[in-house]
Amino acid sequence: MIKIAKTLFILLAITTSIHAQSLQDLVDRAAKTTLERFADKKLQESELSITLIDLRDSKHPVTASFHGNERIYPASVVKLFYLVAAHHWLEDKKIEQTPELTRALRDMIVDSSNEATQYVVDVLTHTTAGYELPPKEMEEWQYQRNAVNRYFSSLGYTNINVNQKTFCEDAYGRERVSRGPNGENRNKLTTDATARLMMEIVTGKIANPARTAAMMELLKREYTGQSSDPDNQGLGFTGIALKGREGIRLWSKAGWTSTTRHDVAYVEMPDGGKFVLATFTSQHANEREIIPTVARVVIDGLKEVK
C-alpha cells in the first residue's frame, strides 16, 4: 500500500508539473501575441503583466504568470482588497453593517466610486482626511491606516501596498503626506496577488458562503449589450473578448487612470472551463484592445491545456 501511495503521489506530481508548464506556455503565448499586435503602439514587455489561474479543478488550482510579481499602481483594482477587508472586519465585528456602509461597498465595486472608497477606507482604518498633523500624530495616523496591509500580510500576501484612498483628482493634507512627496507610499499591487485574491473569493476560501455570495453579486458583470461609458467594467475590459460567445459568465474588477488600464476577471465557460485572469497595462490607457487580446488567447487555448 505504501508503494502504491508513493507511486500515485509521483504520478500526481508529474501530471501537475506538465499542467503547470502547459499553462505557462499559454500565458507566454498570450503575452507574445499581445506584444506583437501592439508593437506599432510601442507596447513594451515591462508595460504588461499577466497572471492566469486555472480553476477547472478548484481544489488544485494551477497558476502561471508573465511579470506577475511586478509592483504596479493598481488604480481601482485596489477596491477588491478593501471589499474583502470590509467583510473580514464585519465578520469579526470590528465594524457594523450600517446602511451607509452597505451603500458604499456597492458603489465602490459596481460603480467604482472613489468617494465611496474613501468612506470605506475611513471605516476600515479609523482614519480621516484633513489638515497636516504633527509628526508624532501623523505616525500614529499612518499606523492605523496600515490596518489593511497588516491583514493581507497575515494571509501571506507580499509585495503589495494597500493603504491609500482613490481620488478623481489629487490628495491633500494628511492624505498627501501619507502618499509621500514622490508617491513612494502609493498603492501597489501585482497581478499575482490580485489573481490570488479573486481566486480566494470565488472558491470561498477568503470568507464564509454568505459573504462570498455577497461579494460575487457585486462583482458580477454583463458583457453583452451596449453602454455609453467606454470604461464600463463589463463591456470595456475582459468582457470585450467574450462578445459573440454564448453561455459565458463574468465577474470582475477593473481599474484605469490616464496612464494605466487593468482588469481582474473570473470567467466560467459553458464547457466547464473556469479561470481567473489578471491583466495590468501601463502607459497605454487608451488602448482598449490590449486586455481582451490577452483574454482571447487564454480562452481559445485553455481547452488545450491538460
Language-model regions, residue ranges each:
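Structured C-terminal helix/loop/strand segments within mature extracytoplasmic catalytic/sensor domains
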Residues: 21-34, 42-47, 186, 190, ...
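Structural recognition of the beta-strand scaffold that forms the well-ordered cores
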Residues: 49-52, 75, 107, 119, ...
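Active-site-proximal beta-strand/loop segments in catalytic clefts of secreted hydrolases
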Residues: 53-56, 109-112, 120-124, 164-166, ...
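Short, well-structured active-site flanking segments
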Residues: 88-106, 117, 208-212
